[in-house]
Amino acid sequence: MKKCIWILGAILACTCMNASAQKSNDEPKGKAIVQVFSNFHTGFGHDNDERGFELDRSYVGYQYDLGKGFQIKGVMDIGQSDDVNDCHRIAYIKNAQITWKTGNWTLNGGLISTTQFNTQEKFWGYRYVMKSFQDLYKFGNSADLGISAAYKFNDWLSADAIVVNGEGYKKIQKKDGLQYGLGATLTPFEGLTMRAYYGLTEGADKTQENIQNLATFIGLKLDWFSLGGEYNRMWNAKHTDGLDYNGFSIYGNAALSKQVDVYLRYDDCSDDKQAFIAGVQWKVGKYVKLSPNFRWNHDDAYGGYQDSYMGYISCYFGF
């Protein structure tokens, strides 16, 4: 299977190089990708000592349209790592991919964005404030090495498939298991989106169970209002038999003006975790967003009851 992935990737790359060498009416064009997530936060009560400025994450890259439906993109992810102290930053290559759009098909190869929760993250819309549910609670990875394909049947139905290493973009492939995923998206009318996704991650050997993921989502987005909900389930987490998680997330926003909107979100994860966030977003010009927000988190996964209350001023800069 790995050989097939690399062969398909090589064919796609060669095709792209050949297409870019040919004369075309499509003029190549590119754009820089820069996104910076930062915040100031302070705790209340027993978290009163937790305060400070934080550079949460930075994305730097470039996207180039070659013409004939081909596009290449490379993105670096600069953020914190669990393997080093908080005062350190570490850089990863998050995307190094080639995309080909032809007819109703979209094909991706390389270090690509995954499809497990991409729709939910875009609908949530405040990634610089908080990760989407599956990303936050480690139900899956946002990018991985492999290939994906999507086909649009008509205006209201599309489907996609993906095959990747299954270990994310921060780890190299050290094991033999792969991850497979199938998804379908329905848009019965403008503004309403429904999606279902199923994924399976193989165990490295007979001692490890296959991980299974089910992700469902429904969301309504209007010009001034949006409301979405998702339910997610994971069987055999960490390749451990019987270690199952599930949970849901509900979120919405309302526009007060072209520059200001308010948002709410509630998460409930079966791993004894709940979270609530409420905030206001202010668009300061074209490239900057500011969002004062309040967060409540509850976590008694270790048998100890504990609530935390935090105030944030989240900041986004990007183009």
For the regions a protein language model found, what residue spans apply to each?
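Outer-membrane beta-barrel "beta-signal"
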Residues: A184-L186, W282-V284, D307-F319
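Outer membrane beta-barrel
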Residues: K23-G166, D176-L178, T185-L192
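Detector for outer-membrane/organellar transmembrane beta-barrel domains
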Residues: E27, K175, L182-D271
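Transmembrane beta-strands of outer-membrane beta-barrel pores
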Residues: S38-F44, R57-Y59, M76-D82, T102, ...
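Hydrophobic, lipid-facing positions within transmembrane beta-strands of outer-membrane proteins
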Residues: D56-V60, I93-A96, W105, A143-I147, ...
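Repeated loop/turn-to-beta-strand initiation elements of outer-membrane beta-barrel proteins
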Residues: K68-I72, N104-L107, D155-A159, E190-A196, ...
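Cleavable N-terminal export/targeting peptides
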Residues: M1-D26
